[in-house]
Amino acid sequence: MAESIIIRVQSPDGVKRITATKRETAATFLKKVAKEFGFQNNGFSVYINRNKTGEITASSNKSLNLLKIKHGDLLFLFPSSLAGPSSEMETSVPPGFKVFGAPNVVEDEIDQYLSKQDGKIYRSRDPQLCRHGPLGKCVHCVPLEPFDEDYLNHLEPPVKHMSFHAYIRKLTGGADKGKFVALENISCKIKSGCEGHLPWPNGICTKCQPSAITLNRQKYRHVDNIMFENHTVADRFLDFWRKTGNQHFGYLYGRYTEHKDIPLGIRAEVAAIYEPPQIGTQNSLELLEDPKAEVVDEIAAKLGLRKVGWIFTDLVSEDTRKGTVRYSRNKDTYFLSSEECITAGDFQNKHPNMCRLSPDGHFGSKFVTAVATGGPDNQVHFEGYQVSNQCMALVRDECLLPCKDAPELGYAKESSSEQYVPDVFYKDVDKFGNEITQLARPLPVEYLIIDITTTFPKDPVYTFSISQNPFPIENRDVLGETQDFHSLATYLSQNTSSVFLDTISDFHLLLFLVTNEVMPLQDSISLLLEAVRTRNEELAQTWKRSEQWATIEQLCSTVGGQLPGLHEYGAVGGSTHTATAAMWACQHCTFMNQPGTGHCEMCSLPRT
């Protein structure tokens, strides 16, 4: 039997060992490599040198001995799609940077924009330390890299987490320019397809067993700032708690933009808050199934918006006369409870961040968490968070549980016959000041949290118009605030704007026009949404002259009576209850019938 040798093959996914013989041909060896890495026979290239010289081809009949490949040698594997330079990839990554991931993934616009930016921190000449002319540079004024920790720590306030794109620049820096950079998602599951043993719980091996996880503070964050466009967006959301005392939940709709206060930073700008069906009490929230969720996302997309996060209240009134609230979330209690961390992780897994540097095509998430809670001054504050990628993996693979009696603690599940769970550790300091490693049973959730600054602009921004008598928000029937044509008629009659675009530019009104059961406009509202998105009054006037809006005006007049100035959207007055009690709506076809009739004039069905 020929003497066996072991050849190491390095790929973007790591190094694997291939057992071969000295007399084995190159073609036979490449078949083993293809099987080990899961490639097609022509889906990769293997080179003797890292600089892609000395390619081993399948057409060669030479043995490994003749190719001077010895026991323990390291060969280099490159997938075919990455074997040569790609102009498409080079347009979206820093110069000289070759990646091993999913080059066909379409990243978000903000990611494409930031990947083309220089990102360096330029400094002016220091009059005291610089000893050179105005055109020279020295260590005191040379531009800094966006990931410079000393610079970030000396900002006011200090930045604990560099931006995600600064982190990418750090990985792609150095002599090798990040030649083998690949952002791999953590997996807590047993790898499938291992044929060397029985499936779990009857067998496991080092090939399919997931690695143990040691929780570390994540050095970067995918979003660096949350900004509400104006105070009205947040105040209308808080009105529910002010009127009921119950906690409330909402989805943040907005867009991702550049955050210029941090090198290569990303900001989540919130333009509107959608409130799904829910049951809230003073200390709990229960989300109900939302049949309109997909429609809301579609309408938001046509308005140039997307779901960027979620928000909930945790408010307890302390002194109703002073209007103060209890300061309950701090370093002595918790910032996010374990249940909230798990919920945030689930949301982030449902909204992954598209990334070309990851073999999976996604890495982390830009989905943010906002909490309306009491601050140190006993006033309402908005706090922003995300959970780490490690937390996302633990939640995705169902390895993390909340603790019932301690909201600040989570619990890593133990392995069972149904599920293998890798060991999860975290580092702590004992009473002697020594660093120790603890098993995450239980686990302080502060190891999973990334804080994000939450702000309001000095100069408010208004994607949607602000009215003194706004259209009711959806799913607030418990307050007596319903979305129907009576409330629409009232809104139109009380609106003081003479510009139709300003009147119709209300996120909740647009959702009602699309989702109402009497006359949904999902197929005919695209022109109006485009007018709102581009702030084009001419397009809005064109849509106003359509049959659909004429029908809506007729319904409003019928339901709310003859409202003076309905078509001008500027007059106030008229009784809105004149005809409501007299006319009746058919339960079968919703046609408004005249009083005194027992059958519907449209469908001829009985009234009851």
Swiss-Prot record:
InterPro entries reported for this sequence: MPN, Npl4, NPL4_C, Npl4_Ub-like_dom, NPL4_Zn-bd_put, Ubiquitin-like_domsf, Znf_RanBP2, Znf_RanBP2_sf
Q: Which Pfam families match?
A: NPL4 (PF05021), UN_NPL4 (PF11543), zf-NPL4 (PF05020)
Q: Which residues carry this modification: N-acetylalanine?
A: 2
PROSITE patterns membership = MPN, ZF_RANBP2_1, ZF_RANBP2_2
Offer one example of a GO biological process linked to this entry.
ubiquitin-dependent protein catabolic process
Q: Impact of mutating residue 50 to A?
A: Abolished interaction with VCP
- Give the UniProt subcellular location, in the record's own words: Cytoplasm, Cytosol; Endoplasmic reticulum; Nucleus
Q: Where is the signal peptide?
A: none
Which SMART domains would you find in this protein's record?
ZnF_RBZ
In residue numbers, where are the RanBP2-type zinc fingers?
580-608
What pathway does the UniProt record associate with this protein? Protein degradation; proteasomal ubiquitin-dependent pathway
Q: In which tissues is it expressed?
A: Expressed at highest levels in brain, heart, skeletal muscle, kidney and fetal liver.
GO cellular component: a single term:
nuclear outer membrane-endoplasmic reticulum membrane network
Per the UniProt entry, the effect of residue 17 to A is: Abolished interaction with VCP
Question: Has the keyword Chaperone been applied to this entry?
Answer: yes
Q: Where is the MPN domain?
A: 226-363
Q: Which residues carry this modification: N6-acetyllysine?
A: 179
Keywords on this record? Answer: Acetylation, Chaperone, Cytoplasm, Endoplasmic reticulum, Metal-binding, Nucleus, Ubl conjugation pathway, Zinc, Zinc-finger
**Superkingdom of the source species:** Eukaryota
Domain comment from the record reads as follows: Binds ubiquitinated proteins via its RanBP2-type zinc finger.
Q: Which family does it belong to?
A: Belongs to the NPL4 family.
Question: What functional role does this protein have?
Answer: The ternary complex containing UFD1, VCP and NPLOC4 binds ubiquitinated proteins and is necessary for the export of misfolded proteins from the ER to the cytoplasm, where they are degraded by the proteasome. The NPLOC4-UFD1-VCP complex regulates spindle disassembly at the end of mitosis and is necessary for the formation of a closed nuclear envelope. Acts as a negative regulator of type I interferon production via the complex formed with VCP and UFD1, which binds to RIGI and recruits RNF125 to promote ubiquitination and degradation of RIGI.
Supply the name of the protein: Nuclear protein localization protein 4 homolog
Organism annotation: Homo sapiens (Human)
**Gene name of the encoded protein:** NPLOC4
